[in-house]
């Protein structure tokens, strides 16, 4: 890309909520990112209502399936997935460790079914839901959490630096 971009954030909860972005539009954006040689960072996550209704798996699998429909592995394309429980974004609430492990496990399994074990093993699944310096290290230590998608805490340089340090070996 002429501007030096390497990643495209696709399907973020704010785009879905504020602009009514649909799964079909996410699919098209993943395809467009692929065509331009960008790594799509596909965001999936449930609302509080969907969570309370016991629909977490249904929602995140549906969203991931739509995104994967626009994805091609040809030419060494890459992909990242970010689980962002909508109810935890900007609220100061973070999903429990059990919630994160369960959701990331669902996403990992779906990736393996869809793109195969080898490719799926290379797809990092990020967590993005009120990540802050106090919880980053614990989140990063969980199974299938390959990184964090930082929102509000990235606006404070000191907070962001502490989160980055939590992810350093």
Question: What role is predicted for each listed range?
Answer:
Residues 1-169:
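Active-site loop-to-helix "anion-binding N-cap" substructures in soluble metabolic enzymes
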